[in-house]
């Protein structure tokens, strides 16, 4: 789905609400790409990327339609594979109105297989959005599934209205230059009678037209997030051409019913917070009842919203207004690192921030509010992600609780009435009022759209799902397309196998090498294989136990029995604060541009070398009010962590610390080994890495 926070960075790597942050986010939309994390992500991918797979130039297919318009491929494509072939296929814009002869050109890229002989199939990929360009995800597709190029061609197609297939560009909507309702209405007016013709039903027919024009008899189809709708629409129309299907965190026809997806996702937030905390030793030690504490925070914000200034992860001050609806939005679309997809920033800190709020300290929670990408924001280049296409597809695919012929005022009344009739716990732990927030209500996001004629639906009545090998996967911490929705989608496909992945968020393939191997092998063998590896988190994301206002509020670091430690409890608490300060800056560097401010004061700057090693320098950073941390840390491409820090402040006698360990590394959670001197006494302590 348009995971509205991992889409445009995923275009840089793999990737918006369903599939948003294209630095490493499939199935999320709309966060501007950021150089620092793109460097790290690119470095990570380069170890797998089958760049220059073919020494020769473009290799044209032998059985293709004369209707194809072949063009020179973009440098981004030829840099990955010189043999790539690119073109356009003109297709009818208005299939349901044969008297209208307008055509829309559908852009595609073909990456040919390596072995001799004909391709066994073409592999299709679609990460949905909607609004995302598929071809902009070429690098991550090749990085993740490159081994399948042995006997399979890769066929990447930009859906109509996206990427190079005449991307919809509604400036006010794309760049948030006017209020959303006005911008959406203007976009609908701009498209006019074409409003109804960007639905997934038409996209399925475009896709099969490209398949037929290129001469492929069989295709394997990977659909992630809202791409599940693309696969569904194709499968019920052209199932005879499918060899296999992989659905990763898929949307499907169940989620198109009014409020169903909204409710599933809202209810999944408590599970996401609970699992993230319980798996992290640092958080679990302080929060024995995460469900109760999360409910307590929601009730507190419902009764008394929080407002104040805070900094984004890139150090930009913003005025934050955090009410219950905004808290649901923050929880449903967690701030996630694009360079380390196995990592939840916002939801990993939300319990600790809630505890601080109870004690009168709103700083941690306000910062979380500042760091989330708002639904109404500048989405940048529409050829990477089109907000106009997002609404053009979403609004004709979904079943809305109003009549399209009704005026806006009547639609608003019908929507409000439908929400009021939902059970009071439909969005639990959140209220129905929170569930009507623009950022999380897929119904409200379409209020100001128009549908002048009936569209080509995802499925017509009584659809027949094909009996082909189908693998369906869901992360147990996904709140963009919750597991409850994914299970319903899986049940529609007769030969499906459902697999849940521990500690995975939205679109599991970017969270675990285990999943990459399972999916790639499935396409090769049509067998699911041993899924044991999905039951244990590959990497445990670091969740925060507490935000100490002063060092005395922190947990004391554990004594390293073999290190000759000489410092007492007070200084061991200072060490915990110092490590938290450094890790806090590192976290923010992965979700921002690398440069930002400390929790309470100070700054940090980051850079990444050619080998993917990140250096972050801290200047007067303050995490607890009575401890100041200076120094630098190096986070290696191998996930190693080394820091040299100078500590000062009223809570400590001061000194220097050397820290070694790993951060966000696969495997069980380890401990940072800390040495040095504080107040002239030897330091030898241990602090959990997560």
Language model region names:
Residues 466, 472-474:
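Short beta-strand/loop motif that positions the catalytic acidic residue
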Residues 479-484:
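Conserved alpha/beta-hydrolase "acid-adjacent" motif
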Residues 204-218:
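Conserved acidic catalytic loop of the alpha/beta-hydrolase fold
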Residues 504-513:
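Catalytic histidine-centered segment of alpha/beta-hydrolase-like enzymes
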Residues 175, 233-297, 329-332, 338, ...:
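A catalytic-pocket lid/entrance helix-loop region that shapes and gates access to the active site
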């Amino acid at each position: 789905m348009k995971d509205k926070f991992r889409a445009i960075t995923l275009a840089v790597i793999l990737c918006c609400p369903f599939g948003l942050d294209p630095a490493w986010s499939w199935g999320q939309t709309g966060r501007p790409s950021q150089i620092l994390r793109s460097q790290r992500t690119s470095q990570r991918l380069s170890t797998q990327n089958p760049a220059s797979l073919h020494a020769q130039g473009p290799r044209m297919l032998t059985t293709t339609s004369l209707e194809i318009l072949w063009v020179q491929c973009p440098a981004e494509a030829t840099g990955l594979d010189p043999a790539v072939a690119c073109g356009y296929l003109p297709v009818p814009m208005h299939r349901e109105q044969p008297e209208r002869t307008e055509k829309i050109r559908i852009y595609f890229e073909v990456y040919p297989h390596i072995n001799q002989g004909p391709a066994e199939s073409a592999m299709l990929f679609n990460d949905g959005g909607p609004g995302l360009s598929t071809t902009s995800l070429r690098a991550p597709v090749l990085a993740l599934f490159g081994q399948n190029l042995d006997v399979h061609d890769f066929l990447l197609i930009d859906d109509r209205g996206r990427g190079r297939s005449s991307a919809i560009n509604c400036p006010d909507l794309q760049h948030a230059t006017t209020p959303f309702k006005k911008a959406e209405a203007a976009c609908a007016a701009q498209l006019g009678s074409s409003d109804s013709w960007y639905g997934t039903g038409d996209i399925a027919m475009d896709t099969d037209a490209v398949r037929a024009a290129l001469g492929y008899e069989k295709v394997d189809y990977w659909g992630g997030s809202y791409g599940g709708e693309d696969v569904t629409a194709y499968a019920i129309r052209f199932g005879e051409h499918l060899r296999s299907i992989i659905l990763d965190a898929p949307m499907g026809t169940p989620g198109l019913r009014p409020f169903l997806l909204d409710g599933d996702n809202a209810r999944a937030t408590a599970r996401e917070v609970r699992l993230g905390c319980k798996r992290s030793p640092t958080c679990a030690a302080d929060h024995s009842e995460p469900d109760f504490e999360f409910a307590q925070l929601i009730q507190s914000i419902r009764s008394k919203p929080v407002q104040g200034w805070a900094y984004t992860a890139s150090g930009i001050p913003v005025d934050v207004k955090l009410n219950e609806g905004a808290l649901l939005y923050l929880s449903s679309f967690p701030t996630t690192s694009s360079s380390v997809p196995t990592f939840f920033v916002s939801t990993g800190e939300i319990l600790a921030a809630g505890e601080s709020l109870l004690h009168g300290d709103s700083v941690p929670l306000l910062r979380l509010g500042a760091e989330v990408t708002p639904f109404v924001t500048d989405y940048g280049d529409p050829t990477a992600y089109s907000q106009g296409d997002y609404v053009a597809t979403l609004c004709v695919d979904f079943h809305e609780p109003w009549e399209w012929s009704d005026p806006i005022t009547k639609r608003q009344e019908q929507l409000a009435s439908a929400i009021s009739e939902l059970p009071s716990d439909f969005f639990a732990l959140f209220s129905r009022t929170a569930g009507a927030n623009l950022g999380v209500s897929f119904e409200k996001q379409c209020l100001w759209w128009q549908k002048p004629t009936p569209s080509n639906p995802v499925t017509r009545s009584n659809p027949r799902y094909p009996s082909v090998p189908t693998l369906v996967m869901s992360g147990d911490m996904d709140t963009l397309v919750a597991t409850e929705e994914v299970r319903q989608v899986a049940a529609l496909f007769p030969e499906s196998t459902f697999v849940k992945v521990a500690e995975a968020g939205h679109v599991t393939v970017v969270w675990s090498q285990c999943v990459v191997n399972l999916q790639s092998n499935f396409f090769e063998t049509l067998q699911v294989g041993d899924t044991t590896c999905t039951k244990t988190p590959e990497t445990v994301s670091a969740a925060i136990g507490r935000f100490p206002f002063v060092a005395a509020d922190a947990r004391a670091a554990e004594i390293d029995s073999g290190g000759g430690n000489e410092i007492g409890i007070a200084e061991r608490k200072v060490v915990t604060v110092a490590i938290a300060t450094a890790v806090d800056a590192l976290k923010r560097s992965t979700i921002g541009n690398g440069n930002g401010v400390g929790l309470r004061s100070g700054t940090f700057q980051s850079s990444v070398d050619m080998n993917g090693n990140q250096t972050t320098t801290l200047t007067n950073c303050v995490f607890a009010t009575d401890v100041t941390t200076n120094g630098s840390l190096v986070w290696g491409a191998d996930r190693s962590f080394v820091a040299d820090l100078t500590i000062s402040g009223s809570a400590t006698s001061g000194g220097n610390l050397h820290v070694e360990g790993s951060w966000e590394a696969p495997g069980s959670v380890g401990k940072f080994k800390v040495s040095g001197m504080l107040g002239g006494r030897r330091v030898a302590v241990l602090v959990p890495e997560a």
